[in-house]
Amino acid sequence: VLARLPDECIDCVVTSPPYYMKRQYLGGGIGLEATYQEYIDNLLAIIKEVHRVLKTLGSFWLNIGDSYKNKQLLNIPHRVAIRMQDEQNWILRNTVVWDKMKGAMSQSKDSLGCEYEPMFHFVKKKTGYYYNSDAVRKKPRSARVANGAVVSATGVSGVRYRRKIELSTELTEEQRISAYKALDDVLERIKKGELSDFRMVIKGANQRVTNGNTSNLSGRAKELQDKGFYFLFYNPNGSMISDVWQIVPEDTQGRKLHFAPFPEDLVKTPIILTCPPGGIV
């Protein structure tokens, strides 16, 4: 079917191919190859066609489980992902951990039971691909005024940061005055509803610096070194969901048409995130 489709006609692809040596489907097919290398080669041939039919700003979500052979976990999902990057120019944006929250009873006496699978998000272009992050954000709590003080969505009132500014032995007097003013400005923005939450990192206050303390590696560290402080502002539309999704698998009991069905919720989030309205999945 893929071979008959024109180039760049699909907005979003979500798929989960047959896993290696897990099930025998009617007519054979992929997943029953003699070696895992042959299995991966066959997958990549199909994925190459996916790359062709996917639009430049489209997304490809690939859910694939792992397999054991000769007592060895084959690490198939990541072998596939790395070859996609190295050989087909796919750009990997996320590895989602699908936490199934339950699993089949493990009979192994020398390895752990597995209750997760990876789901990779690939794109063809580093920037500009369709991504509706606001559609899946966690709804933020609201800021408020308590006892005459502005309190952020997570309870930050400014009192603690004023104390840290006051006690810092590494701030110059000019930096200290600037820090007080900047904090007041941020609290005023919270009061007006322009921001919902923030964090303030102050030099000499024994706080962890974002991305490390070395200025040549972290822009935040350089800002801390130059100004004596910096702010982290939370998105007013809420925080982004994480890359761990807790979704219970579909119940397979009594099924006749397919014994490895996709949970609807596992498909729903990728489509909401990366398929534009009226797009083709």
Model-assigned labels for residue ranges:
Residues 1-281:
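Core catalytic lobe of class I
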